[in-house]
Regions:
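N-terminal signal peptide c-region/cleavage motif recognized by signal peptidases
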Residues: 8-10
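Mature catalytic domains of secreted/periplasmic carbohydrate-active enzymes
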Residues: 13-322
Length: 322
């Protein structure tokens, strides 16, 4: 059985992620039309209609009833459709009408979650939307172990605008696809990890950051600019935290955190685990000071389906402080 361990050193998280210890666990959803409502990608109007129909109050109520401490949502992924306006993105890619939604769903979610004491985090790939050829070309993105200097400068501009738009409404960012950190982000000359983190924190200096470089079954940190570990895993039974590499509640300065999914795969399918299994895994990691995020499929209207809501509620009940 594999164990989670430190692979790459990182610096101190400066206390930004301390709130995760109190939050303990949260929920992620992939609100991507190509996954939950493919027809919505036939036109910009169909996409806007889907985003407009997202029931933020209903979802906030579900998360509160489950006892989740935070919520992580995809801004977008590979299609080029996003859940918030971004003038920098529109200018850089030149696509009209814009594939960025008219509604700022991120801001609306934050406003619905804040009164319930639930923090909001956002997911974004570190590369261009891979299935939007026009955007890939305009952003000058080349997938692979390449410097991608022009792309990085443009992507930081996009990220900075979102960060400034949301300010303290967003408490953290989980960046996917950081598969080539040596080639892209570790060189001393900008743009690099430091400037990327600066763009992410432009609107909120307290935003926590995780950089994900794939499913590798290890709690790792890629940069001193990270505050918590991405730790994407397909099999949560393999998650182990301990040993001499875990010290003072940190993995070399970063707060330990694991992300896995409850469905048959990310964002899809029926529940694959029993309540007892997910409770055991969550309780085990939380008891050691880690935070755990569970991805659950979301419906077109923005609500979590009943089987998953029931399972999330079981986690919350089992971890409730008495």
């Amino acid at each position: 059985m594999l164990a989670f361990g430190l692979l790459v050193p990182a610096g101190q998280a400066q206390g930004r992620a301390d709130w995760l210890r109190g939050a303990r666990w949260g929920v992620m959803t992939h609100f991507l039309a190509e996954w939950i409502a493919p027809p919505a990608h036939k036109s910009v109007e169909d996409w806007n209609r889907l985003v407009d129909e997202f029931d933020v109050q209903g979802l906030a109520g579900q998360l509160e009833s489950a006892g989740a401490g935070y919520y992580l949502i995809t801004i977008g992924q590979n299609s080029g459709f996003y859940i918030s306006p971004n003038a920098a993105y529109d200018r850089l890619v030149g696509i009209q009408p814009s594939k960025c939604s008219r509604r700022d769903l991120v801001a609306d979610l934050a406003d619905a979650l804040r009164p319930k004491g639930i923090r909001l985090l956002v997911y974004l790939p570190s590369g261009a939307p891979g299935r939007d050829a026009e955007a890939v070309k305009a952003l000058e993105w080349k997938r692979g172990p390449y410097p991608n200097r022009e792309f990085k400068a443009k992507w930081e501009e996009v990220i900075r605008e979102w960060s400034l738009r949301w300010g303290k409404k967003v408490s953290g960012w989980w960046l996917d696809g950081v598969y080539w950190p040596n080639a892209m982000y570790r060189p001393p000359a900008a743009p690099n990890f430091a400037t990327l983190a600066g763009a992410i924190r432009a609107g909120n200096p307290d935003s926590i950051i995780a950089f994900n470089n794939g499913v590798i079954y290890s709690f790792i940190t890629l940069s001193e600019h990270e505050d918590f570990t991405a730790a994407e895993t397909n099999d949560p039974a393999l998650a182990r935290l301990g040993g001499n590499r875990f010290a003072n509640g940190r993995i070399d300065g970063a707060y330990p955190h694991m992300l896995s999914f409850l469905g048959s795969t990310w964002g899809k399918g029926p529940p694959r685990f029993t309540d007892d299994q997910v409770i055991e895994w969550t309780r085990n990691l939380v008891s050691k000071g880690a935070a755990v995020t569970w991805d659950a499929p979301i419906q077109p209207g923005g609500l979590i389906a009943e089987p998953f809501l029931k399972q999330l509620g079981a986690i919350g009940k089992a971890l409730a402080r008495r």
